[in-house]
Amino acid sequence: MDSMTLFIASFAVSCIGALASVLLIKADNAAKTAGCLIGAVAAVLSFVAGIQAVLGDATSVDTIVFFPFAHFQLLLNQLSGLFVALISVLAFAGSIYGLNYFDEYPGKKGRAGFFFNTFVASMMLVITADNVFWFLVAFELMSLTSYFLVVIEENENSIHGGWLYFVIAHVGFVLIMASFLTMTNFAGGSFAFADFRDTQFSPAVASVCFVLSFFGFGAKAGIIPLHGWLPKAHPEAPSNVSALMSGGMIKIGIFGILKVGLDLLSASGVQVWWGLMVMVFGAISSVLGVAFALQEHDIKRLLAYHSVENIGIILLGVGASMAAMALDSVGIAVLALMAALYHTFNHAMFKGELFLGAGALLYSTGTRNMEKMGGLFRRMPATAICFLIGALAISAIPPFNGFVSEWFTYQSLFNAAMQGDKAVMIVAVFAAVALAITGALAVTCFVKAYGVSFASAPRSEAAANAKEVPAPMVFAQGLLAAICVVLGIGAPVIAPVLVDVAASVLHPYGGVFAAEGMELMNQYSGAATSTPAIAIALVVLVGLACGYRKIKTVGKVQKSQPWACGYAPNEHMPVVATTFASEVSWFMQPLYTLRDRCTAVCWSIAHFFQKLTGVAEAVEPVPDKVLVDAPHKGVEKLADLATKLEGGNYSIYICYIVAALVVFLVLAVQMG
């Protein structure tokens, strides 16, 4: 069975899972079980389809469905197959996890099953759509279904977080649509992506389209300064949904940037400054993301900020690849893109595991506040071990997967800096320094997160009474933790496959590019691909250390309370999250001020959107609503907008400037 047949079957099964959840909605547990189990089956099918595509079984579909002007075109190639496989793993783990975790939402389990399956199906359609119309339809469906999952608790925090996400998502949607429609206009009015690939746009048009799509998809990916919705929305969603959003959905932002910059605009050629811009935003996002995470005590907000950090790391590889491609350094371009794709998959796995671990802590203790945890290693050992693996992976500790992809990213940046272009050299060195700072702060942050949550003594009654989560939740965490280990130790096998995927993106004659990328990878990847040896050495050393300790301490170990300067130990004495990061927080206070201002801008956009659209407060007769109220409110809104032009709100002024700039750019391109 070919990859497209399997993919369509998985899509149909996801739709069946969503339908089953709705039909059984009055039987809460049955709806949950049906939605989760059917969703797991769909994920297995789509994973197999994705892997087949990655290994070279690229297929497509082109047929007319509903709209003659927009053919239903799907393309499952090596790049889209990789993202399909990535989301499938998270969807499978999330479905199994949901068998117990959705019990936290009584009366809403059927709703959760429906939106979860629809969310997964819409992401799959976004990745494979090969037509503007269906891409935008699927993208909007993805945003809407994830919004309803964010607000499922229907409390004040979830509604506020969901609203901010909804607005930023649609700001991004408008920018993406503007980019695609501009390409459509210059491609003879065609909606087919295939025609975009064959059209040689002028440098100005290509640049406008890329910039619009970069910020549009960047809003979905959570790059700074469009990141404000992540720490608001991710903590409010169910934890398996948070894992899918952070591990999967924001990667669609990366997919979109790659698709436009390196695929749809391929006939026009990549420009050096595109890569430099991407690297600069990547460096800023990586450093600020981890700096903001350090100050957090809410474990899910902390993980959300780390998503910003890792999106930044991925963009470093993407930007280096674009810059190298523009300079005809194809080997470096392939190496850098391979590093970005590797880290994309790696981040999905360890961030998915960490969010599931955070959900397990919330499930057992009833809180996301790390200050109220402590001592959970003894009470939740399986969760503690899985979370530790995720923490080591995200901190880039060998032999785990985060180390491998970050090592390749370093090598691609160093090689890009030596290509002779002064601007590329400066930005690449800046990016490498930013990556080093990010790595150091990430280790600090996860020593804090793990130590405060799992070590020491319980600091609340809930932590003292915590128990290990049910088996399905442990299995889901263990699966993703095991994949983190496999992706690290299996680097010698996995990296060449990803080199082939990267080469297929950068050039239709991928074999030539793959050979150059493979040669460069073999030259500079010794440490990254030696992870099996590192793993064996670590196992041997740990075994020797444990054996030595066992022999030396036989009959000599006595258990006693820790020394506390003569005072009786209590739960308030251990170092907590606040004091652990106090020195770093003091040093980086200006960055936290910047974060507050960025968040304020996001909220200003949300409030502006809310005032612009208005909110229906009551049900009224349709004729009155249409004939009387609508014109009246239209005049009022025009008057309010005229007044707000001089309202003194600088954030709104910025919105006007950006909107006007986009309009003028589009008009200038069309007139030129």
Label every model-predicted segment:
Residues 93-110, 116-135, 145-468:
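Hydrophobic transmembrane alpha-helices and their helix-loop junctions in integral membrane proteins
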Residues 1-9, 72-86, 125-137, 272-277, ...:
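Membrane-entry segments of alpha-helical transmembrane domains in multi-pass membrane proteins
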Residues 15-19, 39-50, 91-92, 180, ...:
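Hydrophobic core of alpha-helical transmembrane segments in multi-pass integral membrane proteins
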